[in-house]
Amino acid sequence: MNTEALRTVAATYGTPTYIFDVREVEARIRLLRSLLPEDTGLCFAVKANPFLIPYVAELVDRLEVCSPGEYEICIQEQIAPEKIVVSGVNKTYESMKRILSYSKGAGIYTIESEEHAKILRTLAEKNQMPLSVLIRLSSGNQFGVDAETFF
């Protein structure tokens, strides 16, 4: 972006204003790809930047969502379910039921508590649906589960 474009944005939207140069985001992803080993997968965390999905979806291997709302945005953007990692602590039976009815079990699901494990196991068994899961092990903080819970 040039100075004149930035002035126009400031005059139109006020300051402070947060601006993404989509071409720069795409260039950074390509740069990461060039610097990392060929078999390295890249995952874009949707979080507060769901508007970047149309620009990054084809450049990364996966998109990580942490809420049912973020998953819904991926559905609207027609992201293939197998490309989505469902992460975060906001997993309820109903939200996972909705997600799994759409994904048919495709994608990756993180387990961040015993409750998440129970929800995913119940829904997988009920629907005879194998799931790919990652267990988020705690390093002694409030996030994840301790290794003794599952191993």
Regions found by a protein language model. Give the residues of each.
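A charged N-terminal "starter" segment
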Residues: 1-132
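Active-site loop/helix belt of alpha/beta enzymes
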Residues: 122-126, 139-151
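ATP-grasp fold ATP-binding core
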Residues: 132-138
